[in-house]
């Protein structure tokens, strides 16, 4: 007899988020959102050892390479407030991946505008039956390459 295994919501979203982030197991990752602790433990279980949640990450100093944001059952307006301070934790070459509930195209446009308003350039996205994710990188990368 084959037993069906229920996959927790955190596991369903972690694979597409990691695929968009393209992060190694050594990169520093900050996790935000209502289920950030659950995602942090799942990342630890998968071998990502340098992961923190927004509740235990210290002061913002551009120390994280990737921010994974679980924004299910929350508004884009509330995301804008979180992005106000979250981007300060990212390195100049940092990347943000935001997971949201399934929404209408207008909601996706609002998400894109919110990311762009915080100095992020949308790079890629994925749509699944239980939500979608968008990755965006900091625009500071271009200024670094000009200096070099």
Predicted regions and their residues:
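Class I SAM-dependent methyltransferase Rossmann-like catalytic core
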Residues: 1-26
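Conserved class I S-adenosyl-L-methionine
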Residues: 24-36
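Beta-strand-connecting loops/turns
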Residues: 26, 62, 93-94
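A short SAM/SAH-binding and catalytic strip from SAM-dependent methyltransferases
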Residues: 64-80
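Class I S-adenosyl-L-methionine
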Residues: 107-148
């Amino acid at each position: 007899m084959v037993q069906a295994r229920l996959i927790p919501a955190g596991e369903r979203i972690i694979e597409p988020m990691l695929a968009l982030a393209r992060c190694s197991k050594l990169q520093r990752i900050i996790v935000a959102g209502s289920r950030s602790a659950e995602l942090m433990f799942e990342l630890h279980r998968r071998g990502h050892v340098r992961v923190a949640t927004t509740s235990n990450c210290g002061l913002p100093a551009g120390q994280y390479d990737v921010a994974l944001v679980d924004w299910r059952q929350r508004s884009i307006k509330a995301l804008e407030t979180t992005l106000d301070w979250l981007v300060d934790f990212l390195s100049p070459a940092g990347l943000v991946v935001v997971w949201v509930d399934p929404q209408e195209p207008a909601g996706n446009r609002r998400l894109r505008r919110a990311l762009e308003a915080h100095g992020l350039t949308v790079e890629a996205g994925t749509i699944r039956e239980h939500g979608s994710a968008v990755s965006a990188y900091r625009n500071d990368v271009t200024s670094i390459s000009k200096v070099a």
